[in-house]
């Protein structure tokens, strides 16, 4: 999206509009509804609509547009003077992406990975509640359905701890790579 958003080419503008629209559509569908909407495609892709493998298409289709938007924001927040300087020195598009955009926005990209990972942890818990297994399944079936609040609470605490660990790791990496 970043590469095509400021282009004067009609083709690039169309590509940008289509990709941005798809990102917005898939970001706006609640995950539990996305799982249900993708059941036929999930059956065709992985051969089942139950279990951990069945959760993968929905997890990928929900996470990819989410992270794509975070990447676009990270790239948009860069000092455009740095990009213009690279262009003035004759850098190719590939060189601008690999030598300027990614290195300069790496703290924001890692933060985006952290946020996306934490969102995926929540999504996997939701997927577990409808048969994908894991802590969500445990909390729902053995906790909520069995009226066992202790199991629900324990699964929730474990999920919270996992989120804290990923947030700590992401923050640590960002601090190490941030040049500011």
Where are these regions (language model features)?
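Loop-to-helix entry region at the N-terminal start of transmembrane alpha-helices
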Residues: 24-27, 31-66, 151, 155-156
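Transmembrane alpha-helices
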Residues: 93-123
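Transmembrane-helix boundary motif in ABC transporter permease subunits
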Residues: 1-19
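Hydrophobic alpha-helical segments of integral membrane proteins
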Residues: 14-26, 74, 139-143, 173
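Glycine-rich helix-loop "coupling/hinge" segments at transmembrane-helix boundaries
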Residues: 123-159, 178
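Membrane-embedded alpha-helices of multi-pass transport/permease systems
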Residues: 53-57, 61-83, 113-114, 121-125, ...
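Short helix-to-coil transition segments within interhelical loops
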Residues: 75-105, 145
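C-terminal transmembrane helix and the adjacent membrane-cytosol boundary/short C-terminal tail
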Residues: 3-6, 153-180
């Amino acid at each position: 999206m970043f590469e095509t958003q400021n282009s004067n080419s009609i083709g690039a503008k169309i590509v940008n509009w289509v990709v941005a629209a798809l990102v917005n559509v898939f970001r706006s569908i609640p995950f539990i509804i996305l799982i249900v909407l993708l059941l036929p495609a999930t059956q065709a892709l992985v051969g089942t609509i139950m279990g951990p493998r069945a959760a993968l298409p929905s997890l990928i289709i929900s996470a990819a547009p989410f992270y794509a938007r975070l990447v676009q924001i990270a790239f948009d927040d860069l000092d455009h003077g740095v990009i213009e300087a690279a262009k003035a020195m004759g850098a190719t598009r590939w060189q601008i992406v690999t030598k300027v955009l990614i290195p300069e926005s790496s703290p924001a990209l890692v933060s985006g990975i952290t946020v996306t990972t934490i969102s995926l942890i929540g999504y996997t818990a939701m997927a577990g509640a409808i048969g994908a297994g894991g802590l969500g399944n445990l909390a729902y079936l053995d906790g909520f359905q069995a009226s066992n609040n202790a199991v629900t609470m324990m699964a929730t605490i474990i999920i919270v701890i996992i989120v804290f660990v990923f947030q700590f790791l992401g923050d640590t990496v960002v601090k190490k790579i941030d040049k500011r």
